[in-house]
Amino acid sequence: TGSCTEKEKTRCFALYSEQKQALAETQALKRPAVLAVSGVHNSGKTTLLEKLIPLLRARGLKVGVIKHDGHDFTPDVPGTDSYRLREAGAEGVAVFSGNRYLLTEEFRLNEQDLLALFERHGYDLVLMEGFKESGWPKIEVVRSAISKEPASFEPLAVVGDVPGADFALDEPEVLADWIAAQMPAL
């Protein structure tokens, strides 16, 4: 504020206060740890996540999930009011109650955009289902009935029933402990 004239001091102080507040809010944001849970189709990714999420939450973590869908999915149920409004041409439709909301929009975005949303809401860990060809740190689910080896390049760990797997499918508690210990590096 040293370059402000006497007349501008009030405006400069307000601007300085806004900048200071914005900086404090930015510094308060912490990036969530990110871990992809990869594997071929029907390898058990969703089943593993269903087991891991409550175990990670029991360890005090706020956990979010980004699920990749290679197909264009329908986010709403035909016949509902929100579906009808979307069909009528609304570019965005939000449905909310006291405890949750769903915002449906159609535009191109990527996982970075979604991670920014999770970051703003203070998530500790974001698990990304799929993303086997991404550069994100990942664990891979490999089941002998489906595939014999990892489909992704250098997973941090293999979860499955194949020789050399780092974690067994039926020991999600051990895997949850390992993930919690790895979080600072993710």
At which residue positions do the language-model features occur?
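Extreme N-terminal, non-catalytic leader segments
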Residues: 4-6, 11-35
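C-terminal accessory "lid"/substrate-recognition subdomains
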Residues: 19, 78, 92, 103, ...
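Walker A (P-loop) phosphate-binding motif
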Residues: 25-71
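Fold-independent oxyanion-binding glycine-rich loops
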Residues: 40, 68-69, 97-98, 129-131, ...
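N-terminal phosphate/diphosphate-binding loop that engages ATP/GTP or pyrophosphate donors
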Residues: 53-106
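Short, hinge-like loop/turn segments at secondary-structure boundaries
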Residues: 80-84, 111-112, 144-146
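Phosphate-binding/switch loop-helix module in NTP-utilizing enzymes
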Residues: 104-133
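Phosphate/Mg2+-binding loops and adjacent switch elements
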Residues: 125-185
